[in-house]
Structure formats: C-alpha cells, structure tokens
Amino acid sequence: MNILVINCGSSSLKFQLIDSETEKCIAKGLCERIGIEGSQITYTPDGGEKEQTVTPMPDHTEAIRLVLEALTNEKTGVVKSLDEIGAVGHRIVHGGEKFAASTIITDDVMKAIEECNDLAPLHNPANLIGINACKKLMPTTPMVAVFDTAFHQTMPEEAYMYGLPYEYYEKYKIRRYGFHGTSHSYVSKKAAEVLGKKYEDLKIIVCHLGNGASVSAVKNGKCVDTSMGLTPLEGLIMGTRSGDIDPAIMEFIAHKEGKNIDEIMTVLNKKSGVYGLSNNLSSDFRDLEDGYNRGDEHCIRTMKTYCYRVAKYIGSYVAAMNGVDVICFTAGIGENAPLVRSLVCEHLGFLGVSIDEDANHKRGEEIAISTPDSKTTVMVIPTNEELAIARETVSLVK
C-alpha cells in the first residue's frame, strides 16, 4: 500500500509517498510560498531528477492538486492513478488532551482538532486546511491524523502540571504537552531495535536537536517527561527560540524597551535562541561551529551555553527515571554536529559516559558513539518522521 504523508505549514506543504511494504520513499517534495507571489513546487521521484516549477498556488487545495498531478504525471509520476494511494497520513501539531494516539479522521476528529487551535494558532489551522484540501480531491481515500503531542500523553501529572492556579488548567487546559512526539517515539524504538533489546526494558533519553529542539525521557516504552511545554517555546535553547527563561523577564523588557506582549513574544520566538545569544550572527550551527573553531567569543559562548542546557536536561531526566541506559541524538543538529555531541557528553562523566571520537564523526547511520566500556550507551539515530507517520497510518487503515 502506498501512503501519502502530508505536513502542512501556513504557507508550505511537505509531502512524501511511501511504499508501506518496502518502507521506501518513492517520491517527495515541497510546495513553498502558498498564497504568496513566487510560489513553487519541488518534486523528486525516487532515482529521478529534482524538478522545480514556479506556478501560482493561491491556496492549499491548489498545492495538493499540483502534488497529486506530479505523482500521477505520465513522464515523471510514480503511480498511474490516485487509486494507487491507499491512505493519507497528516502530521497534526497539537492534539491537546483529546488525542493520546493517532486516529482515523472523521468530522468529529476535525472538530476536536479545531478546538485545539488556541494551543497551536500557527500550525493547527494550516493542518486542517491540508486535510480539507485532501478530502476535496480524494474524497474516498482514508485519512489519518498523527499528532506531535500524542506520544507525551503518558506523562504523569507531576511532570505536566505547572505551578499556576489550578483553575487555569480546569478552564483552559494550561499544562505541559510536549512536541516532536513522532520523532521521539521513532528514535527510542529504533535505538532498542538496533541494540537488540526489549523497548519495554529500557530507560532512554532522546535529544531531538533541530532548529526546534526537545529532550524526552522514555521509561519502559512510555514517555514520562519532555522539555517542551504548553507551546514549543519551553525547554532547550533553540535556533531562534529562547527556551526556559524567568517569566518576569517579559515585564522587565516591556518596561525597558516599551514593547507590548506580542512584540516580546516575537523576540522570544524569532530573535532569541542561539541566534540572539551569538549577537545575531546565525541560527545555523554550521556557522556557529566555524566560529567556535576560529575562537570567536560569541560562538564559543553560544555553543557552550546551548550544550550545557541540553546536558542539564539529560541530568534531570536521569533523576526522573532513576537511571538511564541509552542517550540518543537525532534531527539536523543531533545527527550532523559531532562538536555539539562532544560538548554535551563532556558534562555526563557522572553517568560513566565515554565517547569514541572516530565513531562520533561518522554520518548518516544508526551508530553507537560511546566506547565499549562506557557505562551508558550513547547513539546517533537519524529520525524519520514521515516513515513513522506512514506506519501509524497503515496500522489504522489495514
């Protein structure tokens, strides 16, 4: 069965067509600048040339129509007709407390997703637009919603509650939800598989380090804590997001800079993180690593602070699980920045962590980067959120 995986942003749409039998991606692409001048679709069939076409895309329905047209194109398509697409898996950012697992999309499910729009105002409305566009063009094809938040719904109350008046939880469901759940689930399961151990017997910490970044604690196959909160702003220092700060800083900045709450939130989401910390040098870790190696003081400070925060979260999750067996690094930075992994692991001597620097510099494969005598196994596991979404989709429609 071929599964179309859709990830809709407010003005973009990523897609992959995955053969669920072989688990191979047979085509992928990206629609950019939807509803904006200069919109384009990039399409790459497996083993074929990448094609880029600038074409008007006034809305997501037109973007999905172009995706389906590319997949069924006589010359470069990979399926003869839409009948060869067995189901569509949609990435949904926020499922609130309503969804602890993936689900077949019905009218009631769409209503429940819409009720979570307040919790993810940039993402959920776009996710719903993608579902509606697909339903319009593929009315008989089953659709599945896979939630970023679902994996973290096993967190105990003491891990997800904030020290705020309880009425805010009762009225508005203000609590910690966590994100990147599909990645944390895939990577933790893959680590157990690579090690040949039972998932339910392990204590695993996953560090998903991309432009957005989060850490999760997975004990005996269930998530017991994660670093992101009500929104993806909590936790680690990220590309442009601040991560954890003293909440009173917002009032302080408001008085000093004359900014309102929306302007302050823009600073915390778009101008902070390693970008702000590096004196606005870059949010790209390749630039920061170059600067670190050159001895640039801003880059050294930024890299050290970022890695210290990651290590601090790892340490706290060792306490939360009363131990750890495996620490995994994944996502763009976690997979491709050996310097970040080294600097993080320098703080983990108390866990008996010892890194093999040759292994640490290998790329693109599932690998243990700790030495054979390291008391805790440290691994690099490339994430594959699209495959995880396809697997979830197949399990529900078969």
Predicted regions: what is each one?
Residues 1-4:
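Extreme N-terminal starter segment of soluble prokaryotic enzymes
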Residues 12-57, 229:
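Short glycine-rich, Thr/Ser-proximal phosphate-binding strand/loop in the N-terminal lobe
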Residues 71-123, 144, 150-159:
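Short beta-strand-loop/turn "lid" adjacent to the catalytic site in phosphate-handling enzymes
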Residues 151-254:
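Glycine-rich phosphate-binding loop of actin/hexokinase-like ATP-binding domains
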Residues 219, 225-257, 266, 331-362:
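Catalytic phosphate/nucleotide-handling subdomain of diverse soluble enzymes
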